[in-house]
């Protein structure tokens, strides 16, 4: 008999194991999460397996009594807190502004995954009926918000996920845990109720209308009332800071308790209450710096997954007398993890506005983990099939093979547990394998030769996936000053003695990339040391070593993500501000596609739109032109207009868009060109103000140009570049004229060169 002072009890041993593991995990949590990219669920499950009843035999929850009931209630507490936090962390009015994405992800995608999982279970487990396969498949339809925390939380990898995709996965994982109840009860009612028409009636009236619809309304009412009450208390000074921070946790417990008491879906009540509670993002902004929700979630997740690792039914994974073997479960897990969500998300990608391209669709389809929600739904299903209640009976009650649906009750728990274990391994380590493969593939040896490498020390370290700010023109001054100050710190100061001056002048060495060519200022001038004084290095604030803080300093507002060929700009809440595709930006225009014979651009709609654009451009050019001028004899201006109209649209806009003239300028230009032919007595070699004459090969003025007959000599004009008029103004008598007088008497003429138009 051992000494009474060191007697070990089961609860105290459980406290020591869970507390010891949690302490060790927190001491090295940064390395595990940020370096190894492993979540807390994976490490906690492995700890439970080691200390559980099949290895160390120190932590044995199966000896505590009714294990199913304990597991169900622990899972209920964790889920109501997690789904409430998921709803509270969403941006302002997210469910209303993104209802289309949520509708597609919660109904078509879930139904597709439910039916696909049913087919695999019905094919691989031979003794299961189709309705029983529907019931088991409904347990794994929902995604888990706990396992999805690695991509929807605040970790290092989650910051690389675009905000719109992260918010969509967060809202889906919080809402579909409660949405799995209708799928489950449809299969259960079809199994236990005869005839089938009663099953449909009860399913619509009890499950859809009362439990789900009324549960959502009740949760929204609770959230709105709680939001108004906490605002009132905070304004009147009735709450302290500690109570304010923990208010969301106790409100989640209240939603779970009141939902269970009145018989509605408590998970939907909690999620809707969280979304309504933080509908205006007021509470999220108030608690943004405290991180109290993350602390509570971490404690609950670590404790529960240690418990999950200890209750895994390892002997039941291989039961030959039940036609259940390990290879069937392995094949089933592979098929379900691949085909449950990925094909559905790729299929409905065009109907989800928050999914931009196939890369995001593949990412969203892969991260649909199976976790705590599957265990909770499985225990509810077993209780309904056993005793037609949500409270499970002790395990001894299901040992009788004479009860209905005995085989389904026996194989349901090991099948769901194996799928949960597979999801923990795959989704918990997929980020680690992704980052490892990415790092291996990007190893390269590069060599760059520069004249001076001092400027490289001032460049920020850019990591793949990190958003980069686009600096405005005003920020160029500070950039130049920072480069100059860094060069001053690394080079010695040269002191040159001035013989005429009493003091010495200090000259600083120039930057290597600014030594030959002077740096241009934003206004077109040069940077001057007196105009832009360098800032003192000692007065600068020291850089923070935390990478996240440095990234926040670089990107205080909008964030930019390059996803494949798509450039997405988001605000701080994950809303898409702009979406640009490189294919659209760099691709050929409509006119180029029509010229190249693109079959997609030859459709009637594209041709008609191109025709309307050309017609509108022609109408705008001829809008102010008088009718009498259109009937005149073709002159140089009309020939230029005809050439301009026959040019492609994209070349007109890019080359001569700044030379458009109005009707007054056109009349002045034609009047001056007409006077050229009338002044035969004047010297033709004297250039007139504002007029650029054309010259032929013999350097003589062309008579065809004076008469306005250029249509026969267009090909000859293309081979000659027109010479420019001299800069100095010359009068008709050959004497120079002052610049001011020349500017006053010079006509406002914009002469379009034919050779430039044809180029």
From Swiss-Prot:
GO biological process, one term: proton export across plasma membrane
Coiled coil: none
Membrane topology value: Multi-pass membrane protein
GO terms under cellular component: plasma membrane
Residue ranges with Basic and acidic residues bias: 514-529, 537-547, 590-601, 622-647, 655-671
Primary localization: membrane
Disulfide bonds: none
Gene3D superfamilies, alphabetized: 1.20.1530.20
Modified residues (Phosphothreonine): 442, 448
GO MF entries: sodium:proton antiporter activity
InterPro entries for the chain: Cation/H_exchanger_TM, Na+/H+_antiporter_fungi, Na+/solute_symporter_sf
Cellular compartments annotated: Membrane
The keyword Acetylation belongs to this UniProt entry's keyword annotation: no
Region (Disordered): 514-558, 578-606, 622-759
Glycan attachment sites: 699, 713
Compositional bias per record (Polar residues), positions renumbered to this chain: 696-713
Modified residues (Phosphoserine): 446, 735
Name of the protein this chain belongs to: Probable Na(+)/H(+) antiporter C3A11.09
